[in-house]
Amino acid sequence: MKILIVDDEPHLRMLIQQSLEDLEDEGVELFLAADGEQALEVIRAEEPRLVLLDVMMPKKNGFDVCATIQYELGMTETYVILLTAKGQEVDRLRGQEAGADQYMTKPFDPDALMAKARAVLGI
């Protein structure tokens, strides 16, 4: 199984990756992308089961990437968790409209993120 971590902040990508490293022992592959366009390239090539997606990014924001995954690519089996500092209800609704499965605000609890990843992957 594959997880894609997408964030334009290198330290946050590393933090998320470190939070999920234990899953690699269970056969999960972690992939990284620094912006929305790169994320879509990885998604098309690797077809991850889970995408952890920052909202505010250059080139293509997380809402647009999520909508592309769900509606243009038709990858309805790909589970998307939006990660963002934008915690207002209007942002949550926009995420739902884009097809996101869950929405977590930053700063996030690494243990909660791990629990969500395990639940999605069924491990």
Predicted regions and their residues:
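Two-component/phosphorelay signaling modules centered on CheY-like receiver
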Residues: 10-31
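Acidic, metal-coordinating helix/loop segments flanking the phosphotransfer/catalytic sites
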Residues: 32-50
